[in-house]
């Protein structure tokens, strides 16, 4: 369940980031609102980067065999 929550948090952060980018690109925000949106976007970007880094580390741990890291391409369609 924790894995699903983390995935949902990442997906929600990514969706929120996309919304902020669209609002900024639209150009209808005031300078103050643009700065606030930019700050929120930076926070969301950092959250997403941290989640991706954590997932990458978990993949490396799962692939580690006999003390050696087995480099394998990621296949999203492959079942666990």
Curated annotation (Swiss-Prot):
Gene Ontology CC, one term: cytosol
UniProt keyword list: Cytoplasm, Exonuclease, Hydrolase, Nuclease
Stored Pfam families: Exonuc_VII_S
Protein localization: Cytoplasm
Entry EC no(s): 3.1.11.6
Enzyme class, first EC level, given as a word: hydrolase
GO biological process, one term: DNA catabolic process
GO MF: exodeoxyribonuclease VII activity
Reactions catalysed according to its record: Exonucleolytic cleavage in either 5'- to 3'- or 3'- to 5'-direction to yield nucleoside 5'-phosphates
Task of the protein: Bidirectionally degrades single-stranded DNA into large acid-insoluble oligonucleotides, which are then degraded further into small acid-soluble oligonucleotides.
UniProt similarity note: Belongs to the XseB family.
Subunit structure: Heterooligomer composed of large and small subunits.
Protein name in the entry: Exodeoxyribonuclease 7 small subunit
């Amino acid at each position: 369940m924790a894995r699903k929550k983390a995935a949902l948090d990442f997906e929600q952060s990514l969706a929120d980031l996309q919304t902020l980018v669209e609002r900024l690109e639209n150009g209808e925000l005031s300078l103050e609102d643009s700065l606030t949106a930019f700050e929120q976007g930076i926070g969301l970007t950092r959250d997403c980067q941290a989640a991706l880094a954590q997932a990458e580390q978990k993949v490396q741990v799962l692939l580690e065999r006999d003390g050696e890291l087995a480099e394998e391409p990621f296949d999203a369609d492959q079942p666990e």
